[in-house]
């Protein structure tokens, strides 16, 4: 089997899990959003952002930047994965807590990948993210909108020092 076929099959397995899930409690909600994060970052199915973010969702980052709307959030994910095309996230912990008619979903994961492309971070450096240092924490508020659970607000904190180190050009 070709590598592309294997990667496609792996992605479709994750997609099938997502599509067949019954979302009934904290555990299933947490798993649903974990799988979507895997589709977006590990399989580069960036369009999945539109499946899990409300049209008017707001993503706030550690540096104070705010991305308003699913399209802006998709563009941010695309820019990040462009810099690290082999990016993989490793979910270390995740859970959800019901609060009224919403859930709060927490995720803690690490990232690995190599800065292989020209991007918003500058030219490719071929330096790797160090997963033991490249930690991400995220808290999202999800709500059922037109029958689908969607993120309406999210706060995500990347380890920017780790990302900057991987993107820093070599000393001349």
Language model: regions and residue ranges:
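Tryptophan-centric aromatic hotspots in well-structured domains and transmembrane helices
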Residues: 40-41, 109, 155
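Short, low-complexity N-terminal intrinsically disordered segments enriched in polar/charged residues
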Residues: 1-47, 51, 55
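Low-complexity, intrinsically disordered terminal/linker segments enriched in charged
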Residues: 1-17, 131, 150-172
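Contiguous, function-dense segments enriched for cysteine-driven chemistry
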Residues: 27, 83, 151
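Hydrophobic/aromatic beta-strand elements that line small-molecule binding cavities or substrate pockets
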Residues: 77, 91-96, 135-143, 155-156
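Exposed beta-sheet edge and beta->alpha loop/turn motif
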Residues: 109-147
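Residue-level signal for well-ordered, solvent-exposed loop/turn and beta-edge residues enriched
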Residues: 58, 148-150
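A solvent-exposed, acidic/Ser-Thr-rich amphipathic alpha-helical stretch
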Residues: 30, 34, 46-108, 113-117
């Amino acid at each position: 089997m070709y590598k592309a076929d294997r990667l496609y099959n792996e992605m479709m397995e994750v997609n099938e899990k997502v599509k067949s899930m019954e979302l009934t409690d904290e555990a299933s909600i947490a798993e649903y959003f974990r799988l979507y994060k895997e589709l977006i970052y590990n399989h580069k199915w960036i369009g999945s952002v539109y499946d899990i973010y409300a049209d008017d969702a707001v993503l706030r980052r550690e540096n104070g930047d705010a991305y308003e709307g699913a399209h802006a959030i998709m563009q941010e994910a695309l820019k990040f994965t462009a810099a690290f095309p082999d990016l993989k996230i490793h979910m270390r912990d995740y859970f959800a807590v019901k609060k009224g008619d919403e859930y709060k979903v927490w995720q803690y994961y690490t990232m690995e990948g190599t800065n292989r492309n020209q991007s918003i971070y500058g030219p490719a450096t071929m330096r790797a993210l160090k997963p033991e240092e490249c930690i991400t924490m995220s808290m999202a508020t999800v709500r059922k909108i037109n029958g689908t659970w969607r993120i309406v607000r999210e706060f995500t904190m990347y380890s920017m020092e780790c990302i900057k180190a991987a993107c820093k050009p070599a000393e001349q």
